[in-house]
Each structure stands twice: as structure tokens, then as C-alpha cells.
A protein has these predicted regions:
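Short helix-loop boundary/capping segments
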Residues: 153-234
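Hydrophobic small-molecule pocket/channel-lining residues, especially in calycin-type beta-barrels
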Residues: 106-173, 186
């Protein structure tokens, strides 16, 4: 091989390396752009309904503030509402969350905004749909207020859900707003931390059967109702099991409550064939 041929070969190799490097850079760039675009498009679905977060929330009461002793029985003294919402069939069943991706984060105290997508594990299950009406429609019980408790290594976390308002529930999507107070207490029920959250959540059918797409925006507030942070997340959620009727939930007779709801809302034509006698 001549000196000229050797030089040409070296240049060709260098050009090949540069082309590969260029293609790699383009691929990475497109991945970032597409991920950012998808995240923002998915998130936009949450706000297409004209639903926006509230600016402030009312302050929490003294008995729910740090230093007080948490008394669940006092919180439960207020009776639950008997409200039901009809859901599309694709939304009903038990769902298993594996991971979520945060596409927007904002700290209201520092003003910092982070739009870098961040995926994290968020394993939990949830169920929608409890009773069927005479025509086969599936309904979900929305009894508020209610609570849930999670025991962690350093504290207990109690979610006191004050309201859950469904805005849309049709074949195109399901959207609702939830307001809750989050309490963290120690082993002797002394409150360590209290904050509030407003979540705007939307579900739509996914392209893959047996999956749904979630977009959620959660805004946190301190005990005085001032905003502290906001996180906007997306996720694809898979169905763990199909819908089946739930006749008993947290010690309550769901079929009886469902029939009471239908009667009180003048929908007796939808009463199940084996409805309990009022």
C-alpha cells in the first residue's frame, strides 16, 4: 500500500468514526426530545379539561398539627358520603403500578423548576369498579372522607382523603381531583409532620390491551395551606385482574349501599335483579 493509499484509508476510518459519533449524538438528542415531548403531551391531557390547581388550601386544624397526638376515631366521627360514579369498562379491575416518570418538578419555596424526566419505582395496586347495575354498567364507590395508613421504618403515614371529585368518566378518559391531608406520626401516635396535597389525575385507554395511561399532577401545601412543591408524573399501568363485584369493603355492605344510592338518585330502573329489600 502506498503512502497516499495509507493516508486515504486513515481518513476514511476517521470519517467513519465521526459519522458513528454523529449518529450516536443525534440518537441521544432525539431520545431526550421525544421523551420530553411525550411527557409534556401526556401531561397536557390532565389540563385539557380546564382544571387547574388551587392557589392555596385552608390551614389544618390544631389537632392535626405536629406535636399533637393523632386520634383517628375523632377524624372518623364524620360519616362517609354514599356517592357512586359510573366508570367505563376499560377502567374497571385491579391495576398494578410498577414505575412512574416525573416529567416536571417545581419547588415553590426556592422557585427551582426541573423538567428532566426521572423514572422511579412506585409499586402499589389499586382497584376501580365495585358493583354492576341491571344494564351491566359498572359503578365505583366514592365514600369520603376516608383514610389509608402505611407503616414505614421511621414513621407511620396516614392519608386523610377529604374529597374526591370525578370530572369526567367516559370512554375517552377518567379524570378526578383528590384533596388530602398527609400525617406522619411516630410509634406513640405523636404527629411529626403534616402537609396537604391536591392531585389531578387522568386515565386513558392505552394502545396495548390490558393497560391504561396515567397522567397526574400533585401539588403539596404546608399545614398553613401555602404551596410547597408540585410534581407532574406519567405512567403506563397494567391490569392485574379483571373486574369482579365487591360485596364487602372495609366492613361495609357495598351492594346495599349501591342500591340505596340508586334509590336516592331516582335510578331505580338500574337496581340489580337481586337488590336487597330496603
Amino acid at each position: 500500500m502506498t503512502v497516499l493509499e495509507t493516508s486515504y484509508a486513515e481518513n476514511a476510518n476517521q470519517l467513519g468514526v465521526l459519522r458513528n459519533l454523529r449518529n450516536l449524538i443525534i440518537a441521544v438528542f432525539l431520545t431526550i426530545i421525544l421523551g420530553w415531548t411525550f411527557g409534556n403531551q401526556a401531561l397536557a391531557k390532565t389540563f385539557e379539561l380546564g382544571v387547574e390547581h388551587t392557589e392555596v388550601l385552608p390551614s389544618v386544624s390544631a389537632e392535626l398539627r405536629p406535636g399533637a397526638k393523632f386520634n383517628l376515631s375523632a377524624v372518623e366521627a364524620e360519616g362517609q358520603s354514599n356517592v357512586w360514579v359510573k366508570l367505563p369498562e376499560w377502567m374497571c379491575g385491579t391495576w398494578k403500578v410498577g414505575r412512574e416518570t416525573a416529567v416536571f418538578r417545581q419547588d415553590f419555596k426556592t422557585g427551582k423548576i426541573d423538567k428532566e424526566p426521572f423514572t422511579y419505582f412506585a409499586r402499589h395496586d389499586f382497584q376501580y369498579g365495585m358493583q354492576k347495575d341491571r344494564e351491566g354498567g359498572i359503578w365505583h364507590y366514592v365514600g369520603t372522607p376516608y383514610h389509608s395508613k402505611t407503616s414505614l421504618s421511621q414513621f407511620n403515614e396516614i392519608h386523610l382523603v377529604k374529597s374526591k371529585e370525578f370530572r369526567i368518566a367516559d370512554e375517552q378518559g377518567v379524570s378526578f381531583t383528590t384533596v388530602m391531608t398527609v400525617i406522619r406520626s411516630n410509634s406513640v401516635s405523636q404527629i411529626l409532620e403534616t402537609f396537604q396535597q391536591e392531585s389531578i389525575t387522568s386515565y386513558t385507554p392505552a394502545a396495548t390491551p390490558g393497560s391504561i395511561e396515567m397522567t397526574a399532577s400533585t401539588k403539596s401545601f404546608d399545614a398553613n395551606g401555602k404551596p410547597s412543591r408540585q410534581s407532574n408524573n406519567i405512567a403506563t399501568i397494567k391490569q392485574a385482574s379483571p373486574f369482579s363485584e365487591v360485596d364487602t369493603y372495609q366492613g361495609k355492605d357495598m351492594k346495599a349501599l349501591f342500591c340505596e344510592f340508586l334509590i336516592s338518585t331516582d335510578q331505580t330502573n338500574l337496581l340489580p335483579d337481586q337488590a336487597p329489600v330496603p
